[in-house]
């Protein structure tokens, strides 16, 4: 042994064999898929599968997008039709009032009494139609003035308390608790001393 190959006193001596210097035992061996009979898919196969999955997902996305667009268009059409035909039922009910007025005008020898009774019946039809669609009349004579329901046209001296409706010049109307026309009224200033 030469000086370089001599073992040092604190290091064990190593020997080299013709086989590999480290021998594997059966427990330490890692098994590959080829050894177990399973064929590992090639990169081309994995790429092809990924492309098919991507195409499926893209197709599903396109269908969902188209369905969403169709729903949006249908909803928009429903809203447009609701605005366009909102008063269809009300209009249908008013046709009977129109028919009554035309029938009254068609009578050639109508007396004042016949004409008046026909107008009263027509007014009843109109009032019934209003009630059916929850249109209520505001006739607030003698009530306290409410600026949400009434429009004051003038202030007058009166025996009634201050801010009381003295006279209704034009009736108002409310649709489902929303004023569609305020009542035009004159309001009491109260007594002057």
From Swiss-Prot:
Any GO CC annotation of this UniProt entry: cytosol
Keyword Ribonucleoprotein: no
Xref: InterPro entries: GrpE, GrpE_coiled_coil, GrpE_head
One annotated GO molecular function: protein-folding chaperone binding
Keyword terms, alphabetized: Chaperone, Cytoplasm, Stress response
UniProt key word Ribonucleoprotein: no
Region (Disordered) location: 1-40
CDD domains: GrpE (cd00446)
UniProt subunit comment: Homodimer.
PANTHER family, per database record: GRPE PROTEIN, GRPE PROTEIN HOMOLOG, MITOCHONDRIAL
Protein name per UniProt: Protein GrpE
Organism: Nitrosospira multiformis (strain ATCC 25196 / NCIMB 11849 / C 71)
């Amino acid at each position: 042994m030469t000086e370089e190959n001599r073992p040092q006193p604190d290091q064990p001596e190593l020997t080299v064999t013709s086989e590999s210097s480290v021998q594997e035992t059966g427990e330490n061996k890692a098994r590959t898929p080829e050894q177990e009979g399973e064929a590992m898919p090639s990169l081309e196969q994995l790429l092809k599968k990924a492309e098919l999955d991507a195409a499926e997902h893209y197709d599903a996305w396109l269908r969902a997008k188209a369905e969403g667009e169709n729903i949006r268009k249908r909803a928009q059409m429903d809203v447009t039709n609701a605005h366009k035909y909102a008063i269809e039922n009300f209009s249908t009910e008013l046709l009977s009032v129109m028919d009554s007025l035309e029938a009254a005008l068609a009578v050639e020898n109508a007396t004042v009494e016949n004409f008046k009774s026909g107008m009263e019946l027509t007014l009843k039809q109109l009032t019934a139609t209003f009630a059916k669609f929850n249109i209520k009349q505001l006739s607030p004579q003698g009530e306290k003035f409410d600026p949400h329901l009434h429009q004051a046209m003038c202030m007058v001296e009166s025996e009634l308390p201050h801010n009381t409706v003295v006279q209704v010049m034009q009736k108002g109307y409310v649709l489902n608790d929303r004023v569609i026309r305020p009542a035009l009224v004159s309001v009491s200033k109260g007594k002057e001393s």
